[in-house]
């Protein structure tokens, strides 16, 4: 398939060549376009600019027009001549071998195709012949240098590819030419646009420009460059508000350019990237000046960044700031002097073709004969950089030929050289040229660097300043931003955004199709904005919190009722005092156990009551400090059980007094049965056992455990136990309420008992304090769930225990210690007799 495709291509080439043959021969030419040698190199240079017009016939354009001379191409033309002469004069490179050349002016696509076919012509002939094996093709040149732009290079590379003839371009930078399947013989000494596009995007990012316009020139260079820029910039957060291509035949101010300027103005972008060749760029910027598009930042691609074409546009100084990417500045030593000597040598009219020789079309430069040392084209920085690329390209071919001919021994072998053999060697070259390494990767691309430049209008004439550099593989920018003179006030960096950045903690809500246009919304509480994802708020971790509109999460404060907090110290002191009073009362009652006061209070039953209050008091210590499993298991159940035992004893004590004084004579059988069967003890045991069963069920089914509570307060972690408001807790509490009511009823029935046995008021006070304390606790727990809730629980428990102690035991302690005269049998008998008389009178 490839064989027939190659033959089809050759047939087409032959046909075109024959169609042009009769119109291509010249009778005169300029000296310097050809040089005989052992091996010939071809060079394609644009000594004249093409006339941009539509052609209807495939005729070769005559480049030698008086109004189209291209000084830049002239310098590159001279650079190749100079380099070949320098190599021929060298004894280290290609000794005993002389290089020659054939140079062509390729001002148009047709002249470029013609020159390429001339290069492919068989050695010793002026035409191509059909061949079965292209590997044996022997053309009169072994390699080709050029051409100067992507469009021409694509054509030339496609024609040379079947023959594998090396094509080393000095200015064609399009990434499409790196494809080795289509262009296996293409190499270049200018970096690929792949890197240029990366450098431009990095340049935009370094200044925070995310809202841009893209303009390209018609053709592969501009259109592919704009496409690559958009594809690379969009994933990096840069939005393209406007994109267009300058038409091939456009003129400044024509309707098409006016529409483009209008759309560019409406895009409201401060930064415009112009990826264009220097020829169409002039049309674009003349239109920019006519439309008065000022105050912008223009980013230049390397083809026009330091070209003198654009600065010569009238009014260009007012368009704004121009930054650009340029090939690294290098000098070709001796080139300027070489051009001056050439001018002196060719001064005069073109020569006539020698009889019998072939002078190819577009090997003529009439302007070159009119130059003097005073009016010759100025060799500026732009042309010098490109000339160095030509210099490097010729040296790369020479080194490849040096290796192929085995010249390392001091002499070179002579014999036929096929282009494909030379191509293999050129890929392998690796040498130093004026301290710069020359080598190619597997795609034929060189090692290289870019300069970052800024235009400077401070002086009387246009200049540019190198403000930074860009290294490749990987791409790295180094920019001195202080060197840039911005067009805005106070030399401030212009801003180019659709929407200004949101405040910290505000995420972007995209509006429309461009992600650079958005509204700013605050992040909700508990979320934060991560700088790596500006469109979505991220939730904080479990142990973290964030207020509304936050850019970071903060660690939650862990809170619990600590031992050393002021409120804890107060409660601990009060509870310890109560505990000491309970123990002291137990000791006092043991000392005065057989006195009437202790016996009337219940005798030995008082120790059970005091012990239950001590258990409840001890349980309150487990509310302080970090909750632990033992503390959670003991604190509420132990308190509840202790107070239940106390209430059971208090209830049965009140009930016994009522039976003794009111029902012993009325219902003697019940009284004797109750007394003989130890009814009081049975009741206390049964009641306590029931409550113990409830507590065990509570612990088994709703086991209190330490937990970290995150929901109540966004910025806090509350360490607590899970027993609060659990079903087990409420059931146990309900049992205590039932006992409290029973105690109140029994004490109320005994309100008319003898004074020393009438405890209705004291018991009522104790129970009232109990009810009020726990009502206050449940009310507080329903509205407050903070770290001080255990303190409220302790306070409620302390009030309950204090109420029980002060209501029942404290009056008796007072009598024992302060009124011993009332603690005797006679006083109690008198009180009973008084009660009997009152009952008898009623």
Swiss-Prot record:
Keywords: Cell membrane, G-protein coupled receptor, Glycoprotein, Membrane, Receptor, Sensory transduction, Signal, Taste, Transducer, Transmembrane, Transmembrane helix. It is found in: Cell membrane. Its main location: membrane. InterPro entries: ANF_lig-bd_rcpt, GPCR_3, GPCR_3_9-Cys_dom, GPCR_3_9-Cys_sf, GPCR_3_C, GPCR_3_Ca_sens_rcpt-rel, GPCR_3_CS, Peripla_BP_I. GO terms for biological process: sensory perception of taste. It is a multi-pass membrane protein. Residues 20-568, 626-640, 703-725, 784-789 are extracellular. The chain crosses the membrane at residues 569-589, 605-625, 641-661, 682-702, 726-746, 763-783, 790-810. GO terms for molecular function: G protein-coupled receptor activity. Pfam families: 7tm_3, ANF_receptor, NCD3G. Changing residue 626 to E: In strain: 129/J. Expressed strongly only in fungiform papillae. Residues 1-19 form the signal peptide. Residues 590-604, 662-681, 747-762, 811-842 are cytoplasmic. Putative taste receptor. TAS1R1/TAS1R3 responds to the umami taste stimulus (the taste of monosodium glutamate) and also to most of the 20 standard L-amino acids, but not to their D-enantiomers or other compounds. Sequence differences within and between species can significantly influence the selectivity and specificity of taste responses. Belongs to the G-protein coupled receptor 3 family. TAS1R subfamily. Forms heterodimers with TAS1R3. This is Taste receptor type 1 member 1.
